[in-house]
Amino acid sequence: MNKQDISVQLYTTRKFQPYPPILNFIKEAGVVNLELFGLESMNIDEFKNMMESNNITSLSTHVGFEALQDAKNLVERAKKLNIKHIIVPAPPARKDREFKNTFDMNEEEWITFGKDLSSYVSQFEDEGLTLGYHNHSYEFSALPSGKLPIECMMDQNEKLKFEIDL
């Protein structure tokens, strides 16, 4: 495996800020790619300088579903960092009812979430970017109908990408 094939998911370092020493550590480990998170709120110019000074690039970023509502802002930010893939890492948290766990959604809710995600695909595609979803184990736990949440969601648009997490 080529070292350029490996990326560090920056989310895994979120408790170890500030970023300059983290990026230096990542560089020293021989990793040259990052997957960012929080693109919608980070200081892009500052982060770009940190990445450039460590010879690190980023092709993808995780953003909260709510951030998609300002697609224009995400596109501008992504392009400044040469990011090609916008990834939503989870369904939005629900505040209108109690859940057994954060993502205790029924089949209809998974289908709706898939449709909601899919409604943004063309906005990013028109700008040369892809929109995808990052899975967890719960998307592979069968719903009462026998369908998997990941199927309910991904069946809504064949252009929605899937960032698989094993």
Language-model-detected regions and their locations in the chain:
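N-terminal pre-domain/capping segments
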Residues: 1-85, 161
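Glycine/Thr-rich phosphate-binding loops of Rossmann-like dinucleotide-binding domains
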Residues: 44, 96, 141
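Catalytic-core regions built around general acid/base machinery
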Residues: 46-53, 116-124, 152
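Surface-exposed, active-site-proximal loop segments in enzymatic domains
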Residues: 69-75, 92-109
